[in-house]
Amino acid sequence: MPDSPLGRTLVIANPTAHSGRGEDGARFAQEFLQSYASATRGFEVVRTQGPADATRIARGARGFDTILALGGDGVIHEVVCGLMALPREARPQLGVIPLGSGNDYARTLGMARNDVEAALAQLVRGRAHHVEVGRVNGTPFMQTLSFGLDAAIALDTTNRRAAGTSQEGEALFATSALRILFNAREGFPVCASFDGEKTQDLSTIIFAVQVGPSYGGGFKICPNADPTDGLLDVCYNVKLPALPRLMALLGLARLGRHTGSSVVRLRRCRSLTLDFERETPCQADGEKVCGTHFDVSVVPDALDVIFPS
């Protein structure tokens, strides 16, 4: 792409993102790229029409240099799934135009959130870096995979967004947490093995596998997670805390200050295997995942993703 920062560009936009503001964002992106002709070697703007549409579109994006995903973490997840279906050498670089209520992947990248003009300005001046992608039972995730209480909360926030709640980000996560807490205090028995090591028997309330530091709209569950290091960061509990302590830990996690608790363990790994005693709430980038057995791994240098300069 010697003559333009983005080359031949495909914008995949979710018009319903951020309570319908995605359509305005798609129009602005089109006007911006038309007026800033040197940014691309031609572009297209395609709007999604339903679930998994962004995956289908991204999978067919051979020949493009750049895909820009416009919307929340959901559309970014779908685009990543589509890109990962292509051979490595055929995958366009990825840029994100964050327009959503969670925007955790945008936080990881340092992108402007819910400001299409600012995000586009960052992208045309940005630089691509190799980043990892996680996999769970073969399905990619680009930011977070979680089980137990935090997964139940994440799925509840997804359902509430679909129902039209006015809450966003940390406030949405916190109120969903209060709704779920009282039903999840017994824990979820699981056998866990990290990198093929000896199996650990846990009764977990929180088990988060991260590519980037945050989930839930800014909760820094693995504050040192780095999407370029080729490792997954994992946070889980090793004891069942009483409800007041659990609520306090969730509050500390907002700032990444829960990591010193004797209840919490953090570690890094390249793979892990989880066998739950019963079906347990599970989500990958906000999408529900079903089952009791989970093979989790990391794909280093899976994608080229644009970071702000």
Across the structure, where does each feature detected by a protein language model lie?
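ATP/NTP phosphate-donor binding region
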Residues: 1-67, 77
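ATP/nucleoside-binding phosphotransfer catalytic cores, i.e., glycine-rich phosphate-binding loops
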Residues: 194-201, 226-227, 232, 236-309
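Short amphipathic alpha-helical segments
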Residues: 23-25, 80-83, 107-109, 220-221
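Catalytic core of DAGKc-family lipid kinases
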Residues: 13, 45-48, 84-205
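Short acidic/glycine-rich loop or secondary-structure boundary segments that cap or lie
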Residues: 150-153, 200-202, 214-218, 242-245
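Glycine-rich phosphate/pyrophosphate-binding beta-alpha loops
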Residues: 146, 150, 208-222, 288
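Polar, low-complexity loop segments and adjacent catalytic/binding residues used for recognizing
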Residues: 73
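Gly/Ser/Thr-rich active-site loops/lids in small-molecule metabolic enzymes
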Residues: 159-172, 217, 223-244
